């Protein structure tokens, strides 16, 4: 992979520039960015797995340590308050030494409740950035996640630095290794649970390390959009496999989906047609194109596909207008990707947070942005046999538009989704997923 150290220099300079810019605009003196703290399970002494504040992760790859803080004014070297308690119950992390540490003044915190000793004495013009507003109250922050600051950072997080792009390429490389292992396990007859174990082993990450709960769906389970159950027994008849699974690197996410048929049949041909359509949609990405228009184009392409495979009848434009395509493809084409899987600012029109909503008929679209260089998005068209949606379609008079015999033929296969992670450049698109050989 790329040498991160020189890339990080420019990344931290950009972070400092953004802070200085927004502080001047919002008339603030500095930001205190809290990594977060543990959440305890109800009536128990066990904590939920810790997930760091994404605004904290944007600065440095300290991902699993609560009670840390970044203090920054955009001018001076930022301070990292690093939590290192005296604790004989748990492993205590070493003081970090890495490519990024020289860019911070590191102060050690041994007791979380003593952090006030390391904060500025007057917090009137400092803003707290984080989840735990009760902590902010106790410490005396008057400015807590101010809209002007949050909207600014969310907008600018959409434009990835070279360091961030390098991290996302590496996250894709790791995830592709897992996808290859999972595909092999499927064809060898593994259960969903066994495929999941093969995937995690191949990427060297645990269930709490990956950026989201993997979707490992065999047969009809592939029709459940966010299927996260794992059946331990392999199915008696093996028809299809949908895997939506990612990986993390330095806090940045990969989010990749593939679908496979166990045998050569009409479903296999449908996968190939969907794959061709997905590649065409990636080719349509360029600066100045609104993502909403790509999503609408997907519905018109899907309508043609439904007609070609005899799944629907009529005119393609009517299938879109009547919402028939939305029954088979109810989710959005994709979303922003970065520190979060569904990254922020998908609906932002500017750095002030002006909201551009999804079209009324496409409420599950997660992005309405105009594409620009350094944006990273997923492109993930789908096709599913979802009985609850088909029942609604039958009930409201659109049943004649559907070939129910073909629907019944495809039902055991569940559905298809194909998803790549794409960087928008000025003159080209960079499909990180395909570039790594995952076809």
UniProtKB/Swiss-Prot annotation:
Its EC number is 3.4.13.9. GO terms for molecular function: aminopeptidase activity; metal ion binding; metalloexopeptidase activity; phosphoric triester hydrolase activity; proline dipeptidase activity. GO terms for biological process: proteolysis. Pfam families: PepQ_N (PF21216), Peptidase_M24 (PF00557). Binds 2 manganese ions per subunit. GO terms for cellular component: cytosol. InterPro entries: Creatin/AminoP/Spt16_N, Creatinase/aminopeptidase-like, PepQ_N, Pept_M24, Peptidase_M24B_aminopep-P_CS, X-Pro_dipept-like, X_Pro_dipept. Splits dipeptides with a prolyl residue in the C-terminal position. HAMAP family: X_Pro_dipeptid. This is Xaa-Pro dipeptidase. It comes from Shewanella amazonensis (strain ATCC BAA-1098 / SB2B).
């Amino acid at each position: 992979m790329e040498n991160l150290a020189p890339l990080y220099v420019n990344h931290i300079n950009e972070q400092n520039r953004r802070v200085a810019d927004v502080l001047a605009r919002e008339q603030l003196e500095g930001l205190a960015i809290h990594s977060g703290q543990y959440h305890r399970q109800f009536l128990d002494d066990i904590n939920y797995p810790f997930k760091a504040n994404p605004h904290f992760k944007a600065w440095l790859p300290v991902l699993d340590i609560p009670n840390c803080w970044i203090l920054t004014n955009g001018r001076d070297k930022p301070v990292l308050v690093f939590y290192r308690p005296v604790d004989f119950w748990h492993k205590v992390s070493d003081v970090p030494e890495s490519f990024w540490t020289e860019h911070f003044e590191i102060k050690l915190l041994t007791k979380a409740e003593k952090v006030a000793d390391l904060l500025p004495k007057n917090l009137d013009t400092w803003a707290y950035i984080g989840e735990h507003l009760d902590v902010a109250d106790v410490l005396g922050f008057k400015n807590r996640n101010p809209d002007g600051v949050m909207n600014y950072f969310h907008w600018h997080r959409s434009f990835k630095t070279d360091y961030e792009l390098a991290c996302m390429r590496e996250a894709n490389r790791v995830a592709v290794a897992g996808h290859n292992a999972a595909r092999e396990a499927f064809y060898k007859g593994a259960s969903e649970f066994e495929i999941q174990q093969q995937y995690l082993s191949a990427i060297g990450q645990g269930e709490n390390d990956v950026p989201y709960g993997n979707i490992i769906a065999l047969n009809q389970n592939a029709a459940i959009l966010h299927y996260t159950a794992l059946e331990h027994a392999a199915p008696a008849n093996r028809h299809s496999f949908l895997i939506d699974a990612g990986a993390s690197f330095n806090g940045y996410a990969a989010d990749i989906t593939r679908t496979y048929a166990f045998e050569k049949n009409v479903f296999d041909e449908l996968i190939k047609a969907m794959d061709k359509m997905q590649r065409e949609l990636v080719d349509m990405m360029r600066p100045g194109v609104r993502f909403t228009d790509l999503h609408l184009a997907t519905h018109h392409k899907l309508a043609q596909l439904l007609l070609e495979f005899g799944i629907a009848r009529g005119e393609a434009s009517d299938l879109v207008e009547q919402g028939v395509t939305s029954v088979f493809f109810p989710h959005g084409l994709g979303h922003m990707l970065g520190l979060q899987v569904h990254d922020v600012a998908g609906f932002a029109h500017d750095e002030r947070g002006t909201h551009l909503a999804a079209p009324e008929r496409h409420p599950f679209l997660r992005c309405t942005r105009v594409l620009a260089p350094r944006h990273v998005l997923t492109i993930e068209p789908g096709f599913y046999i979802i009985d609850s949606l088909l029942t609604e379609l039958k009930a409201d008079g659109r049943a004649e538009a559907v070939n129910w015999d073909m629907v019944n033929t495809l039902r055991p296969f569940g559905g298809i989704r194909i998803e790549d992670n794409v960087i928008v450049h000025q003159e080209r698109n960079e499909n990180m997923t395909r570039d790594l050989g995952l076809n």
